[in-house]
């Protein structure tokens, strides 16, 4: 997998009080793709994009998202390492520019109850020579593309701990448009993974479960390993799930495996995972799991946990 796209980063902005501390009051109450004057973030998004361009990071698009004070900036494709670097820089730029404008930017997955959470949509494209493996052939995906998707679906439950690292992450799953089930579709936007059949050189797949609490280097590396695992083991891609998750029959949903629904469950999956044990150094995996267990204990005494806030 050689190229990853600017990750569909979603963030929320909150106003500060007179003591320069962030409040729970959103900067605006605009909706998806709203415009000024309802969308009060247009100038700030422009400032962020221009700052990124000065740092040789070129946004592809920006807009107001569904939630109050929620915004999204997408990047152009780059190689996986560069995409991870860009995300780290992007988060710092967003927080700095927001602070300069008297606002507090949070990447917390579920900062406002009963409103859309903020995810990190990771878009993957794979080049084989000069050809895009995910570009449709005769109206469908190539066998290699299908096996890569199958590899991700097979291993995504095990790697969820690395894609969603805080207790707050799991409050987003299954809420409103956020994924809960391990499923895929060509066009249904509610599924965990979407594989469009767009006849373009930049067609790729989109994983919708990750959030901005993840270490992007771990996330990218594990997703690449999952794709390779699918190809090597010739994993078979299950049938697409084209039903609306919210109105699907319970018998149909019962056939689907779910993502871990809590940090504790994600830790348990990771501890038992042969996939992670084979791909990560033993000391690194053990240390990461130990840190996450400490976070679970911390939650018993405070909510949200310090880790939730520090990664937001």
Go through each PLM region and give its residues:
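Acidic, His- and aromatic-enriched active-site or binding-groove loops in soluble protein domains
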Residues: 24-43, 84-89, 133
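Accessory "access/gating" subregions that flank catalytic or transport cores
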Residues: 45-48, 53-59, 75-80, 91, ...
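Residues forming anionic-ligand binding surfaces in small-molecule and nucleic-acid pockets
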Residues: 12-35, 55-78
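Single conserved hydrophobic/aromatic residue that forms the stacking wall/gate
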Residues: 1-11, 301-312
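A short glycine-rich, hydrophobically flanked beta-strand micro-motif that places a catalytic Asp/Glu
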Residues: 8-9, 61-64, 104-112
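Active-site neighborhood of thiol-dependent amide/isopeptide-bond enzymes
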Residues: 77-89, 112-113
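Catalytic-core signal marking the mid-to-C-terminal active-site face
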Residues: 96-97, 103-104, 127-303
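Beta-rich nucleic-acid/ligand-interaction surfaces
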Residues: 68-74, 109-122, 167-178
């Amino acid at each position: 997998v050689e190229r990853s796209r600017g990750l569909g980063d979603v963030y929320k902005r909150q106003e500060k009080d007179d003591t320069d501390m962030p409040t729970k009051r959103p900067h605006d109450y605009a909706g998806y793709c709203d415009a000024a004057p309802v969308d009060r973030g247009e100038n700030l998004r422009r400032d962020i994009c221009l700052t990124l361009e000065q740092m040789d990071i070129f946004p592809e698009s920006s807009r107001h998202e569904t939630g109050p004070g929620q915004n999204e900036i997408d990047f152009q494709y780059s190689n996986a390492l560069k995409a991870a670097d860009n995300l780290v820089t992007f988060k710092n730029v967003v927080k700095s520019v927001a602070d300069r404008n008297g606002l507090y930017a949070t990447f917390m997955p579920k900062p406002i109850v009963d409103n859309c959470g903020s995810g990190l949509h990771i878009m993957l494209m794979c080049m084989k020579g000069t050809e895009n493996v995910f570009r449709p052939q005769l109206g469908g995906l190539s066998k290699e593309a299908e096996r890569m998707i199958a590899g991700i679906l097979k291993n995504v439950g095990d790697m969820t701990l690395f894609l969603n690292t805080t207790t707050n992450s799991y409050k987003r799953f299954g809420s409103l448009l956020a994924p809960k089930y391990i499923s895929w579709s060509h066009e249904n936007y509610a599924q965990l993974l979407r594989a469009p059949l767009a006849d373009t050189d930049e067609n790729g797949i989109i994983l919708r479960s990750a959030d901005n609490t993840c270490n992007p280097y771990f996330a990218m590396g594990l997703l690449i390993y999952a794709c390779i695992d699918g190809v090597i083991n010739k994993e078979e891609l299950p049938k697409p799930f084209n039903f609306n998750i919210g109105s699907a029959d319970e018998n149909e949903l019962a056939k689907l495996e779910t993502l871990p629904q809590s940090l504790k469950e994600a830790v348990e999956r990771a501890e038992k995972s042969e996939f992670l044990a084979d791909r990560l150094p033993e000391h690194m995996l053990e240390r990461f799991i130990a840190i996450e267990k400490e976070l679970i204990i911390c939650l018993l005494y405070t909510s949200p946990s310090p880790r939730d806030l520090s990664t937001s």
